[in-house]
Amino acid sequence: MAQRSPQELFHEAAQQGILAQPQPWWKIQLFMWEPVLFGTWDGVFTSCMINIFGVVLFLRTGWLVGNTGVLLGLLLVSFVVLVALITVLSGIGVAEHGGISSGGVYSMISSVLGGQMGGTVGLLYVFGQCVAGAMYITGFAESISDLLGLGDIWAVRGISVAVLLALLGINLAGVKWIIRLQLLLLLLLAVSTLDFVVGSFTHLDPEHGFIGYSPELLQSNILPEYSPGESFFTVFGVFFPAATGVMAGFNMGGDLRDPADSVPLGSLAAVGVSWFLYIIFAFLLGAVCTREALRSDFLIAEKVSLVGFLFLLGLYISSLASCMGGLYGAPRILQCIAQDKVIPALAFLANGKGPNKTPVAAICLTSLVTMAFVLVGQVNVLAPVVTINFMLTYIMVDYSYFALSMAHCGLAPSPEPVPRQGPDTLHCSEHLLQDRAPSYGSDVPARSLSEGTLLEFTKDMDQFLQPIEELESRQLGSREGNNPKNQKRKGKKGAKQTLQDSFLLDPGSPLSFPTRTSERLSVAFCGEQESYQKQQTSRSESHDHLVPDLRNQPRVNREDFFLKCRLQEQEIQRRPSVFYACMCNPWVSLLGALASLLIMFVIQWLYTLASMGVAALVYFYIGQASPGLYLGSASNFSFFQWMKSFLVPSCRSLRSAQEQIILAPSPAKVDMAMTQLTQDNADFATRDRYHHSSFLSREQLMPPY
C-alpha cells in the first residue's frame, strides 16, 4: 500500500491511515501533529490574491478614474503593478541564490545585505503591514456604518476594534484555518467580481450617475480632471496600497512544501490576474459612470453591480481577508527577527506554539499596533503611510538583487545556486529525517547536519534494527539451514561472521540504511548497495567463502564517498530552465529602485524623510545592540564605490593613447663596498678570498627619486 503524505490541507483522513501502520517504538511521536504544508495554488496564489484584493480596489478605483481619466488611470494602474512586478522578480532572483524561509522579506534582505539592514527593513515592513491592516479594517467599518446609517466616527472605530479582535482569534487558531478561510473568501470575491461585470451592461441607474455605455461618455472621461487639492502623485499614493500584497507568498515560505517552485509561480500568477482585474474595473467604471459620480461616490461600483449585496459582500470579505493576511505575515517576520537575536528587546517573540510554530506573542503585539492606528479612522490618511513603508521595502528588495548580482558577477566568483529541494529529495550525506522537520528563521543554511539528538538516535536505531520484511526474508532463507541434515554439512561460522549476523551489520559500506528508505537515496549509493547485495548473495551460495576475510577487502574512504555523492547529486538536482529566469535582470531592479525612490519624494516628501530618519535610527541601534550579525553575501559590494568607478573616470580629462608611456622597472642602484677581515699573507695567496662582509645603509638601498 502506498503511503499518503500527511502534509495536506485536509489531512485528518490521511493521518488515520498513517497511524494505523505499525511503526518502531523509537519513531512514535506522542502529543505531536505533523505540520500542515501548502502548495502553489492553495497557499501562495490564494494569499497573494486575498492581500491584493482590498479596500482600494472596491472603494477607490472609481475615484481614481474620476480624477485621472480612463487613459491615464489605466497607465497608473499598469505602473503600480509594474513596480510590484519588478519587486517580485527581484525577490525571486534573491531566493534562487539563498532559498526561501518563513522570514520572508527579512530573510532575503538579511542574507544579502546583512542582519543589520535586514532587521531594519523587516521592522519597517512589519510596521507597514500593521498600518495596512488598520486601513483595511477602517474601510470595512466605514461601509458598515454607512449601511447602518451611523455617521459617528466612534461607531467606525468600535466596529473596527470588534473586527480586529475576531481576526485575532482566527490567527491564533493556526495557519490551517487561515488558509481554509482564504479559499472560501477567494471564491466569494470571484462571485462579487462577476456580479460587477454582469451588472455593467444589464441595468441602469441614472439617478446615481450610472448611465450605461456610450461613446460620448467614454470620450468625456478619457482625459484627467483632478479635484481641488489632488494631483497624479496624490492619487498614486492612495492607490499604491492595492499592490502591497505581492510579497505575501515570500512571507509564508516556512509553511510551503516546495517554496522554490511555489513562490515564483504563485506570485507571478497573482500579479497577472490582479492586473487584468484592475484594468477591467477601471475601464468599466469610466465607460458607464459620469465623472461627478466617480469622484464623489466611493460606492459607485455597488450601483453598477447587478446585485448590490454581492458587491458589498465582496468588499467586506476583501477588507477582512487583507487584514488577516497582514496579521499572518507580520508576526512571522517578527518571530524570525527575534530568533536571530537582531534586537535583544524582542527576544520574547521567538517562541511559537504548535507544529507550525505559530507566533502567539508576535500576533498579539502586531494586533496592538494595528489597533492603535485603527483609532485614526480615515483611509486617505493611512494610505500614504502604507505607501511609503512598502515602497521603502520594495526599494531594498530591488537593491538586494542588484547588489547580489554585482557581487557575484564582478567582484567574486559566482557560486552554484542552491539546488531545489523537493518534498521527496533526500541526499545520502544528510539525515534521514531532515526533510520531515520544517525550518523556521533565516539561519537554516548555517545549521550543522549533526544537530538534533532525536535524529541521531533514530538513525542509529535504523542501522541496528532492520525492518520486519527483511527479517522475514532472512528467516525464510535460513529454514533450509535449520535442517539437521544441512547443519552437518555446514562448517562453523567465525567470530566476525557471527557478530555481523547478530547485529545485522554491513561491513562493506560506510553507512547503513533501512530498506524502506532506500528508494529515496541517491543513485550512486543505491548502485553500490545493489552491487554489495549481489556479492553477499554469491558468497552465501558458495561454501568456500563462509568466513570472508574483511582485512583484504578495500575500505571506502568516507570523505571520497560523500564527495562522490555530492557531485552526482549536483548533476541530478540541477535546476531546470524556467520561463521567469530571463525576466530577472539586476539593471531593471536598479531602475525600479531609483524610480520608487523618486516617487516616494513626490508623493509625500515629509513622510519619506520621516521614514528614512526612523530607519537610520533603527539601523544604528541594531548595530550597537547586536554587533556580531551576519554581514551578508553581498558585503564585498559597495554601491558608492561602484558609482565612483563609473563617475570618476568620466570626470577626468582623458589622455590620448600617444601620451601614455609604459616604462620597465629599473633595478635599484646599489654600490658594493668590500671590507677585508684579515691581512694579506703569502701562505694563503693561492686561495680565493672568502669571508668578506659588506655593510649597506638604508639610504643606499633606497635610490633617490
UniProtKB/Swiss-Prot annotation:
Which superkingdom heads the taxonomic lineage of this protein's source?
Eukaryota
Coiled-coil spans are none
For biological process, the GO terms are: inorganic cation transmembrane transport; potassium ion transport
Report membrane topology.
Answer: Multi-pass membrane protein
Q: Name one GO molecular function term.
A: chloride:monoatomic cation symporter activity
Q: Where in the cell is it found?
A: Membrane
For this UniProt entry, what's an example GO CC term? membrane
Matches recorded under InterPro entries? AA-permease/SLC12A_dom, SLC12A_fam
Stretches of Basic residues bias are at 486-495
Which key words are in the record?
A: Chloride, Ion transport, Membrane, Potassium, Potassium transport, Symport, Transmembrane, Transmembrane helix, Transport
Region of interest (Disordered), ranges: 472-512
The transmembrane residues are 38-58, 69-89, 92-112, 121-141, 159-179, 181-201, 232-252, 268-288, 306-326, 368-388, 390-410, 587-607, 612-632
Q: What does this protein do?
A: Cation/chloride cotransporter that may play a role in the control of keratinocyte proliferation.
Similarity remark: Belongs to the SLC12A transporter family.
Provide the protein name: Solute carrier family 12 member 8
Source species: Mus musculus (Mouse)
